Amino acid sequence: MRTWMAATPLLAVAVIAAPLTAQGAAAPAGEPTLDEVRTLTMRYQSVDTALADGYIRDPGDVCETAEMMGRPADVGTMGIHFFRPDLLGISGPPNPRIDGTGTHTDFRKPAVLIYEPQADGSLQLVAVENLVFLKSWESAGHTAPPTFLGNAYNRMVDDPATKVDEAHHFAPHYDLHVWVHKENPAGVFAQFNPSGTCSHHKPKAHAH
């Protein structure tokens, strides 16, 4: 995720019989299945609906690729990120990095939506994402990364010894992508999608 992003804690829900995920494994109590996440976020195939619900397009209007992060080009792309500042706990500009108080992990209402530019100029919803800031997560008493359906979030911290910003201009954080709207050969929880493309991206003239 990249750009400006009060945290809504994930409420534990007592479940007697855990539902099945798309892969057929039982979802942990209180967590939605992949099918449920897909169904609940299908409405955001309309960018106008996403904007009306408080999602904001990345002010930098960047379509992110693996190559930008110092990875081989064939690793794939992410896309253009739209985010909810309230769910990420972001209340101001970078200083010097984008930082917030967010610890929101409920994929029923993801903090980030990811779109892939299409040849006709439209945007296709491909994935959803949650991002939590490391400092806030640990301050809440957590000693391990958040997880979703048994998959640990990725720990993102910049390494000043490299030219690439591994944390994408963000303060240290955890994030997890879930590709429920586009098949991903690398896996539903991979950061990048080898079948994705940013070739049709036309940055907005006003973006900076």
Q: Residue spans of the language-model regions?
A:
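Bacterial N-terminal signal peptides
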Residues: 7-19
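Positively charged n-region of N-terminal signal peptides that target proteins for export
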Residues: 1-4
